[in-house]
């Protein structure tokens, strides 16, 4: 499957160079995430190194010195596994998970060369060729302001292994087809990326791409669960009826369908917004900043419920390891933990809403979407729903948003998905 993902499909390369699928230009995000949506239905775990490689390449190109970019870009975007450099993110520490500002790993500049020392506690794809690492470049500056972003190579220019080691691998509940481990940095050589005073801000670019990828994976897994449930319901009989003909089963499948379609509408809208944002559209940048944590928050929680429902629909067989249901159920819990738990993500949504009058920006955007869609019997209901949800959001944010951030996030997610589903189908020209 690595050969299909990295070589044949070029999923980690298509956003960064031409030539994938014989195309003369880079492919837009909606193509990459559309293919990922399909690929994850057959293999979830491999999407982690794919996402890490893709997002590391993006962040390096965006903030890195041209000399460093030129040094590694061909290997990061190679479609040959023998030449490919995979990426990773080493950020979490045992006492610094969600509280990134508590990171202790420190960086020393000795004669113009940076060296990293410290322990990273949860690192996926730990044997990657390159990793983005947050480290404290000035011990006198506390919090995230003292963190700089570094690129850590597995091997030095001499070919020798860099000075860090994998202490142990994690015995995880799910995601067992890719490794996660603990890393000890022993004065490891690294390249500084961008402005040291903006290290955390730069890392958030990679984090947000990973969050979106988690949402895409959640949506893809929901689709697989739905397809499996539809197959079982159409082929299994009980009480002399097909399961699909039983009203209770129809109701359960409809709920699964609605939640799955909501996630799909959101991830593909986010893909469209990302392309516009990268092309400099300010409104799209602001909306994308909001929609990304919304997807990470809600879709990554919904997939856990959908996976459980799919297991139940298969019955006793769904609880047996011979079928795929147990693996999907275990894997489904990953997305709501990686790159921020639900509480952290919901609070991030509020931060995005409160910045630069984004509440009004988002409301105006949604009204415009509804008004530019052909008027039908649902138009007034959609506009009324916008007014009701945003009235609730404003009230809650003014009173005590910390206790209601999850309700706000869920309300906005389902409102946005409803409106995006109502949009007319658009063809993507490549």
Task: Tell me what each language-model feature is.
Residues 419-430:
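Single conserved hydrophobic/aromatic residue that forms the stacking wall/gate
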Residues 158-163, 167, 179-210, 227-244, ...:
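A glycine-rich, basic-preceded beta-loop-alpha segment at the flavin cofactor/substrate interface
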Residues 26-31, 37-52, 56:
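Extended, domain-scale alpha-helical bundle/helix-rich regions
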Residues 261-296, 312, 394-403:
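C-terminal helix-coil-helix/basic helical segment that borders enzyme active sites and/or dimer interfaces
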Residues 353, 362-400, 404:
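Long, amphipathic alpha-helical stalk/connector segments used for oligomerization, subunit docking
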Residues 1-25:
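Extended, charge-enriched "interface" segments that sit outside catalytic cores
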Residues 113, 117-161:
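A short core secondary-structure module
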Residues 289-366:
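Alpha-helix capping/hinge segments and adjacent helical runs
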């Amino acid at each position: 499957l690595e050969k299909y993902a990295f070589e044949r499909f070029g999923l980690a390369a298509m956003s960064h160079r031409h030539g994938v699928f014989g195309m003369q230009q880079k492919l837009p995000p909606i193509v990459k995430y559309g293919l990922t949506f399909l690929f994850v239905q057959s293999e979830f775990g491999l999407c982690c190194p794919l996402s890490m490689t893709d997002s590391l390449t993006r962040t390096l190109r965006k903030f890195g010195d041209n000399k460093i970019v030129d040094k590694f870009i061909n290997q990061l975007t190679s479609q040959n596994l023998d030449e490919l450099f995979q990426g990773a993110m080493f950020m979490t520490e045992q006492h610094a998970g969600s509280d990134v500002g508590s990171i202790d790993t420190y960086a020393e500049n000795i004669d113009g060369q940076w060296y990293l020392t410290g322990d990273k506690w949860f690192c996926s794809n730990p044997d990657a060729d390159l990793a983005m690492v947050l480290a404290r470049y000035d011990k006198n500056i506390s919090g995230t302001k003292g963190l700089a972003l570094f690129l850590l190579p597995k091997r030095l220019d001499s070919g020798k292994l860099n000075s860090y080691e994998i202490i142990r691998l994690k015995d995880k509940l799910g995601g067992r087809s890719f490794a996660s481990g603990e890393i000890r940095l022993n004065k490891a050589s690294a390249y500084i990326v961008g402005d040291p005073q903006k290290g955390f801000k730069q890392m958030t670019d990679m984090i947000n791409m990973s969050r979106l990828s988690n949402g895409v994976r959640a949506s893809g897994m929901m689709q697989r669960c739905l397809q499996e449930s539809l197959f079982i319901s159409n082929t299994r009989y009980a009480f002399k009826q097909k399961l699909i003909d039983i009203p209770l089963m129809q109701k359960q499948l409809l709920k699964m369908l609605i939640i799955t379609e909501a996630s799909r509408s959101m991830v593909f809208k986010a893909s469209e917004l990302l392309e516009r944002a990268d092309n400099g559209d300010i409104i799209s940048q602001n909306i994308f900043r909001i929609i990304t944590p919304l997807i990470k928050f809600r879709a990554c929680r919904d997939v856990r419920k959908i996976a459980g429902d799919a297991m139940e629909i298969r019955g006793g067989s769904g609880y047996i390891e011979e079928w795929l249901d147990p693996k999907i159920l275990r894997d489904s819990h990953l997305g709501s933990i990686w790159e921020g738990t639900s509480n952290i993500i919901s609070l991030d949504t509020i931060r995005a809403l409160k910045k630069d009058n984004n509440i009004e920006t988002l409301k105006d955007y949604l009204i415009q979407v509804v008004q530019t869609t052909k008027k039908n019997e649902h138009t007034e209901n959609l506009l009324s729903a916008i007014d009701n949800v945003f009235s609730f959001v404003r009230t809650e944010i003014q009173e005590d948003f910390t206790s209601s951030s999850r309700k706000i996030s869920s309300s906005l997610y389902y409102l946005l998905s409803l409106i995006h589903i109502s949009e007319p189908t658009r063809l993507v020209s490549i």
